[in-house]
UniProtKB/Swiss-Prot annotation:
Its main location: Golgi. Residues 27-62 form the EF-hand domain. It holds the Pfam family EF-hand_5. The keyword Metal-binding applies. One of its GO terms (molecular function) is calcium ion binding. The gene is Necab3. Residues 193-203 have a biased composition (Low complexity). This is N-terminal EF-hand calcium-binding protein 3.
Length: 353
């Protein structure tokens, strides 16, 4: 009996060691990886202090303070900070934004799934189903834009308070001195558009710069799909020897913007361009908006047709237009060229066929 028991023990052997369980990635980890990958210009998985400073400089922290922060995260003092360490550092400081970033990651997956399905099924769907799809996309965009506006308002307010001065004063100073960091350049073009009722002590949505970027990314993706689903075409027909009348509505304004996009930023720029064109085309005083891309390079020409100059100038101050101008700062190889010209309003004939 003892031999049988010993034989059983030998056959069974010791229990297999349990495999260690890998914990799920922390909320926002994937988002941070994507963000810091863009900051890593040479794609070596690390940030030098120069790369760190170029990306994080906001005009508030001094270079010495940024160096102190960099050294505090880079505990080995290698002067090359691994992006994973940056992810871990910010993950420990998420606070109330932990569920926000987790929701953004879930939203990103859900939107991509919905868009892929829409691209496959839209053309074969009935007219009613196509109408419903466009309606749902528009409403989704509206909800995201509302959240984005709240985030941008909070962001602008906090940055203004951090500088201890009004944003319009910051804009004037930024225009009168050499351009600093990428983020400082963005502020120089940002309009005074925050909600006046929001303050850091209020209970409304707070600031999360990465959350703001993700909301804008989702809006751009949805707007790009809407732009693919709907299209209108204009034509101009001049009359001969026409007697022109004077007045604010006697001429239309055509604005031409020429841009040269960096090759590695084409995808992000195209999304932002589609978002801007969709928003602009929906304005009541905008007659038409269209864009052309050169086949042999990354050059684009954007055309906007407006009922009058005043409407176009008001549009230039809108949050969407300001966001597009910030995109130009980030993604262009050289400053854009903007030209405006007036045409007799009677030349404009809209082709609805």
């Amino acid at each position: 009996m003892a031999c049988a028991g010993l034989l059983t023990v030998c056959l069974l052997g010791p229990p297999a060691p349990q495999q260690p369980r890998h914990s799920a990635p922390a909320a926002g980890h994937a988002l941070f990886q994507d963000v810091f990958r863009r900051a890593d210009k040479n794609d070596d998985g690390k940030l030098s202090f120069e790369e760190f400073q170029n990306y994080f400089a906001d005009g508030v922290l001094s270079s010495a303070e940024l160096r102190e922060l960099f050294s505090g995260i880079d505990d080995h003092l290698t002067d090359n900070l691994e992006t994973e360490k940056l992810c871990d550092y910010f993950s420990t400081h998420l606070g109330v934004y932990r569920p926000v970033l987790a929701a953004l990651e879930s939203l990103n997956r859900a939107v991509l799934t919905a868009m892929d399905t829409t691209k496959l099924e839209y053309e074969q769907a009935s007219k009613v189903d196509q109408f419903v799809t466009r309606f749902l996309l528009r409403e989704t965009v509206n909800q995201l834009q509302a959240l984005q506006t709240s985030l941008e308002g909070a962001s602008d307010t906090l940055e203004a308070q951090a500088h201890g001065q009004r944003l319009d004063e910051e804009t004037i100073k930024a225009q009168s001195r050499p351009c600093g960091s990428r983020r400082a350049g963005r502020r120089a073009l940002r309009s005074i558009s925050w909600s006046p009722s929001w303050s850091p002590g209020s209970s409304d949505t707070g600031r999360s710069s990465e959350a703001e970027q993700q909301w804008r990314l989702q809006v751009n993706r949805l707007q790009e799909l809407i732009d693919q689903l709907e299209c209108k075409a204009p034509r101009l027909e001049p009359t001969h020897e026409e007697d022109l009348t004077k007045g604010f509505d006697s001429h239309i304004l055509v604005a031409q913007r020429q841009v040269q996009v960096a090759e590695d930023a084409l995808q992000d720029f195209h999304r932002a361009l589609c978002c801007y064109m969709n928003f602009t085309g929906a304005q009541s005083h905008c007659l038409h908006v269209s864009a052309q891309k050169m086949l042999d390079n990354a050059a684009f020409t954007l055309y906007e047709f407006w009922q009058d100059e005043a409407s176009w100038r008001r549009h230039q101050q809108s949050p969407c237009s300001k966001a597009f101008q910030r995109t130009l700062i980030d993604h262009l190889q050289a400053p854009d060229t903007l030209t405006t010209v007036f045409f007799p309003a009677s030349w404009w004939i809209m082709n609805n066929n």
